[in-house]
Amino acid sequence: MLKKLLLSFVFLIATSSQFAHAALELVITDGINSARPIAIVPFRWEGAGPLPHDVSAVIASDLQRSGKFSPVATSKMPQTPYSETEVNFDAWTNLGVDSLLTGSITKNAEGQYVVNYQLIDIVRGQLTKGQSRALSDEGQLVLSKDHVLFNKKATVPGKRLREYAHRISDLVYEELTGEKGAFLTRISYVVVNDKDKYPYQLRVADYDGFNERLVLRSKQPLMSPAWSPDGKKLAYVSFQNGQAEIFIMNIYTGEREKVTSYPRHNGAPRFSPDGKTLALVLSKTGSLQVYTLDLASRKLTQITRGRSNNTEPFWHPDGKSLIFTSDRGGKPQIYNVNLSNNSTSRITWQGSQNLGGQITPDGRFLIMVNRSNSGFNLAKQDLETGAVQVLTKTLLDESPSIAPNGGMVIYSSIYNKTNVLSMVSIDGRFKARLPATNGRVRAPSWSPFL
C-alpha cells in the first residue's frame, strides 16, 4: 500500500481564489465564417443591481468557440424577445438565423437566481407562424408549440451562475448537433515562470480559462498532468526529490500519493478508461519502456521491450489496447499494442515523425504531432482509412489533449516567442488561442465530462 503523503508544496483547493493576473482568455484566430448562425438574445434581468455574470454572453462565447456556431451580434438583432410568444419569425429568418435562445433571470427570497430559458426553432416557427396544432390526450386540437425545442427553469446560487451558463451551452449544443457539449469541463496545465519563487505551477481552470486556480507549486519541474475518469484526481510527474516521480493528487482535498519512484525516469502517466489502471513510462531497465500499474494491487506489468525508447502511452476508449510513441524504426512513430497478447503494429506512416498520439472518444481518429517540411503541427489520422489531415499551422505544436466530446483539441504552441495554449476544432476549421500573461504554459490536459 502506497504511503499517503502530506503536501510539502503549497496546495490550494479548488475553492480558493482565482489568480486574476494569470487568467487565460480565448482569442479567436480563425474559422468563424464557416459556422452556423444562431441568436443568443440577452437574458432579461428582473432584479436590482448588476448580475454577477452575463449568462447570455457566456453562452454565446461557448457556442462560438465550438467552431460550429456564429452568434449574431446584439447590435444586429432585429428584436430582443424574452419568450417564444414575442418572436418575429420572419425577421430572424431574413437574417439567416434558424435557432434562437432567449430567457429571463429573477432572484428569489433566498437570494438565489431563477433562470428561465427557451430554445426556439426559427424555421419551424416561421413555417407554422407559431400556431401548429396537435391532438391532446382528450382528442382536442391544441397549440403544440413544436417550434420550442426546449423550455427549462433552474434555481442557481450566484457563485454558480457562470457554471450554469456553461450547462445551458451544453444543452443547446446537444439539441442542435446531436452531440454532447463539453463546455462544463476543465483543463489542467503547467505554468513555468522563471522569475517566480516557485517557478513550476500546476493549475486548473474552466475550459475557457476562467476560474483559474493554483493546485500545486514547486521549485522543481512539474510535468504531464492527466485526469482521472471521474475528474477528481490528477496524475503528474514531479522532480521534488531530485528525480522524476509519479504522483496522484485529489484536486479537491489536496491528498496525494507517490505512485512510482523507480531509478532513473518515471513519466507519462495515463489513467485507463475505468480508472483502475495507470499506463506509465519507466527506464529502470535502461531504455524507456511502457508499463501498466494496477492501482488496487500495485501490480506492475511491462508492456514494451527492447533497446528502443517507447513512451507517451494513451488508452484506446475500450481499454483493451494502448498506442505509444517509439523510435524503434529510427525516428519517432506511433504504434499500437494489444494488451491481451502484446501484439504490436505501427499505425503512422505519413511524415518524418509522429508523436504525442491520442485517440478520439469514438475511436475513429488519431490526433498527433506530425513533423513535415513545415515543422511540428497537429494532424488527424483516420484510423480506418489511414488518411491524414494537418490541422494547424502554428509553431512547434506539442501535447495535444482532446475534449471529452471529441469536438476540439487543446495543445501547446509557440506564440510571440513563448509557450501558449491553443485550440483547434477536430475538422481544423476553427482555431483559437489562450495567451498567458505571466509564464510559459505547457502540458494541457482536458478533463472528462464533469
Curated annotation (Swiss-Prot):
Its main location: periplasm. It comes from the Bacteria. GO terms for biological process: cell division; protein import. Residues 1-22 form the signal peptide. GO terms for cellular component: periplasmic space. Gene3D superfamilies: TolB, C-terminal domain, TolB, N-terminal domain. The keyword Cell division applies. Keywords: Cell cycle, Cell division, Periplasm, Signal. It is found in: Periplasm. Part of the Tol-Pal system, which plays a role in outer membrane invagination during cell division and is important for maintaining outer membrane integrity. PANTHER family: PROTEIN TOLB, PROTEIN TOLB HOMOLOG. The Tol-Pal system is composed of five core proteins: the inner membrane proteins TolA, TolQ and TolR, the periplasmic protein TolB and the outer membrane protein Pal. They form a network linking the inner and outer membranes and the peptidoglycan layer. Belongs to the TolB family. This is Tol-Pal system protein TolB. It comes from Vibrio atlanticus (strain LGP32). The lineage of its organism: Bacteria, Pseudomonadati, Pseudomonadota, Gammaproteobacteria, Vibrionales.
